[in-house]
């Protein structure tokens, strides 16, 4: 059975790139552009993995990761965080919030797929 991946990404180009790449590798993909909808969408879609942009309008991806960890229905879903604004200490904060993996943009296709497959096993 194909794995389900939800992508929370406000940038349409990145969302399309991640979606097309994962779909080409036989994943079932759901995209969410508005982070405010991410938690409810995750409950409905029940993904095996969430790919979370950290810099989102209206809500921080970091806050969403922390909220997922506090929600009984979502805390077991692994999160791969991606961000264009990788500063000193960001990876530590993101991993401490509960992310299972971290990538800084721009992300190479190979590193992205390795990270996804590494988390999903």
Predicted regions and their residues:
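Active-site beta3 strand of CheY-like receiver
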Residues: 45-51, 56
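The feature encodes the CheY-like receiver
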Residues: 57, 66, 75, 87
């Amino acid at each position: 059975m194909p794995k389900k991946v939800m992508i929370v990404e406000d940038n349409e180009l990145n969302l399309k790139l991640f979606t097309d790449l994962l779909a080409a590798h036989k994943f079932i993909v759901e995209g969410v552009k508005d982070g405010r909808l991410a938690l409810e969408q995750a409950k409905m879609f029940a993904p095996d993995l969430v790919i979370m942009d950290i810099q989102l309008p209206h809500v921080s991806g970091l806050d969403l990761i922390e909220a997922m960890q506090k929600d009984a229905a979502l805390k077991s879903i692994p999160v791969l965080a991606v961000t264009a604004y990788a500063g000193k200490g960001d990876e530590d904060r993101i991993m401490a919030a509960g992310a299972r993996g971290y990538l800084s943009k721009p992300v190479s296709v190979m590193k992205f797929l390795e990270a996804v497959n590494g988390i999903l096993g």
